[in-house]
């Protein structure tokens, strides 16, 4: 079964959401060394350092022990991007981060935009007033130990499993019986600009009502960026059949 959902505007046929992925022109450098290297987004610092032959493959031999300095360093990712007027003229523009690992400070055109502390969640920031045709973004990642040691010092008891429990990120990066200690950082999911007028679809989820061998019944729940908007409709296509739901 295929499902497609489209938001349309009755008063205008120009109600389209534009998405611009920011995956190009990235570099990475240590905060203590201004030498920069090409970086991949999505990706992580260990992969970028390997690609630039700064470190050896940590999964080979005992190389794991030679690269522990990576997780103790501050890493800065930078990029520039251009936006056309078709994006800049939209009423609403957000900068979206689907995954930053983990303690990051984000600057857009020199302005502090966001601080993150959770690699599992996404972040969305309104940025229309900060954007121009030519833009620069910078993301600085701090070592997790900076925050973990502080959190540990504030407790009167010793917690099991060491520092890992204080940080919301993939726990296997701290080492496991099947894998090395590679506490990485970086932009591990998509970064993108989202621009729209009036309203846009925020997220969609299905709610099952019941099913038999012959058929199933479920609700399609659609959350909008502006749920109070009227004069629009939700078009849902399921298995080739279209349904129109008016927003009122």
Put a short name on every predicted segment.
Residues 1-2:
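Sec-dependent signal peptide recognition
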Residues 7-9:
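C-terminal motif of bacterial Sec signal peptides marking the signal peptidase cleavage site
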Residues 14-32, 72-200, 226-228, 241-243:
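Accessory beta-strand-rich segments of carbohydrate-active enzymes
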Residues 25-53, 184:
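Predominantly extracellular/luminal regions of secreted and cell-surface proteins
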Residues 57-68:
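Surface-exposed, low-complexity/disordered Ser/Thr/Gly/Pro/Asn-rich loops and linkers
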Residues 67-72, 209-213:
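Short, solvent-exposed beta-strand/turn "edge" segments of beta-rich domains on protein surfaces
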Residues 106-108, 215-248:
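Beta-strand-rich binding/interaction modules
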Residues 195-228:
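Surface beta-strand/loop "capping" patches
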């Amino acid at each position: 079964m295929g499902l497609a959902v489209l938001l349309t505007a009755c008063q205008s046929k120009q109600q389209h959401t534009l998405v611009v992925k920011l995956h190009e022109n990235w570099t990475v450098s240590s905060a203590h060394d201004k030498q920069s290297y090409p970086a991949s987004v999505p990706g992580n610092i260990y992969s970028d350092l390997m690609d630039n032959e700064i470190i050896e493959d940590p999964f080979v031999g005992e190389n794991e022990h030679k690269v522990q300095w990576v997780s103790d360093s501050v890493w800065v990712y930078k990029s520039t991007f251009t936006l056309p007027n078709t994006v800049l003229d939209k009423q609403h523009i957000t900068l979206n981060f689907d995954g930053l690992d983990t303690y990051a400070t984000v600057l857009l055109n020199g302005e502090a935009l966001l601080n993150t502390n959770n690699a599992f969640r996404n972040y969305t920031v309104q940025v229309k007033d900060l954007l121009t045709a030519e833009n620069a973004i910078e993301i600085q990642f701090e070592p997790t130990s900076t925050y973990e040691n502080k959190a540990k010092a504030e407790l009167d008891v010793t917690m099991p499993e060491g520092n890992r429990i204080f940080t919301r990120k993939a726990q296997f990066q701290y080492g496991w019986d099947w894998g090395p200690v590679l506490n990485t950082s970086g932009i591990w999911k998509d970064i993108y600009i989202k621009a729209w007028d009036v309203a846009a679809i925020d997220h969609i989820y299905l709610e099952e009502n019941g099913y038999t061998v012959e058929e199933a019944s479920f609700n399609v729940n659609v959350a909008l960026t502006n749920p109070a908007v009227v004069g629009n409709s939700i078009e849902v296509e399921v298995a080739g059949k279209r349904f129109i739901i008016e927003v009122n």
